């Protein structure tokens, strides 16, 4: 029943390095713990989606990113919240990846997607990636 629920705006980064893209494993103690996802998080009040993504990448991975165009937007209903996830094409412009929040981080090829258990909100995005739509 989505009609009476507040939508939580969430942003994430699709970061490529040659033919691999970055995924992050959620900490065990958080909701959807140990599932894989794209780096990102909630948009704070007064922030643009792009500002939120830059902040989240800094907080979670200690890197600065440039935010490009929207790769895809999905609306997903979890039992505990309704999210609108906006995934941006992004690139690391400075800093070295550090795991400041996640359990693990990996660079994977598209054909490796089935080897990882992802957050349900990412499923349609992953399908688009597997169809070869960069």
Model-predicted regions and their roles:
Residues 2-22, 42:
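Conserved N-terminal beta-strand and adjoining loop/helix that marks the start
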Residues 15-16, 23, 90-92, 107:
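Conserved hydrophobic "DFG−1" position in protein kinase catalytic cores
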Residues 20-59:
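Conserved Nudix-box catalytic region and its N-terminal flanking loop in Nudix hydrolases
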Residues 49-57, 70, 88, 105, ...:
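Hydrophobic packing within well-folded, soluble alpha/beta domains
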Residues 60-67:
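Short secondary-structure junctions
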Residues 64, 72-96, 106, 129:
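Active-site-adjacent beta-strand/loop module that shapes the phosphate/pyrophosphate-binding cleft
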Residues 89, 98-129:
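NUDIX/MutT-family hydrolases
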